[in-house]
Amino acid sequence: MFYHPVNGSIPIDRTTMDYVAFGIGEQPLILIPGLGEGMQTVKGTALPMALMYRSLAKDFRVYMFSRRTVMPETFSTAEMAEDLYYAMQQLGISSANVVGVSLGGMVVQHLAIQHPEAVKKLILCVTLPCPNDVLVDCLSRWIDMARINKFGSILTDTAIHSYTDSFLRKSLWFYKLFAGLYRTKHADRFITMAKAGIAHTALEGLANISCPTLIIGGRHDKIVTGEASEQLHSMIPNSELYLYEDYGHGLYEEAPDFWKRVKEFFI
């Protein structure tokens, strides 16, 4: 019932990439998380992830990859995509359904462009093709906070910019409590990943994405904007767009039908 959880790491350039795997299905499904993973990799989380995503674990073998643990000061989303492709090769995954959320969505755009054979179907969730003023403002603020180790403030600010008012009324107290206790050893890694988001662009290659693609966004997204999803849709041939009218950047946690929608697209 725990869906065969596995914690693993892949050696790469004198560091490692942590990953978890779980699920009893035959089809591989890859999930690439957003910037929050910059504070803490997925190391050791296979069992809780299997329980959290059990609706997917029944039909897929799910893989969630962190970026490399130690990064240079500058490391682009395109380079992260090359790391992901390398990790897939090391695990014998020739082709997979792929979901990228926020910064993870920027990474998998490059994966689909540079290695089309590796992506069977693609979901781009709350992400964008290139930076806009809203994203740059958020990431620049979080970089400034990270430089003085105010990661608790980053967590709280992210929640305020991600969730609906009704969700925040019920949950913000928890984020503030957790933020007061939160510590990370990965400040430099987080900053590198945030800078990669500011520098991201896939504009020249999006027209070459040939796999079936679903773009999911939130009309009230205060981090990448809902318009960014519409922009992606206009640039990726034959893509589908679903825009949640009542949610923002945290729609993948708030929208009750989100993972059902993901599952139906892949099946």
Question: Where on the chain are the PLM-derived regions?
Answer:
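Conserved alpha/beta-hydrolase "nucleophile elbow" surrounding the catalytic nucleophile
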Residues: A96, G100-G105, G218
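Flexible "cap/lid" loop of the alpha/beta hydrolase fold
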Residues: M106-Q109, I113, V119-N149, R189
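Conserved alpha/beta-hydrolase "acid-adjacent" motif
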Residues: K222-A228
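Catalytic histidine-centered segment of alpha/beta-hydrolase-like enzymes
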Residues: Y247-W259
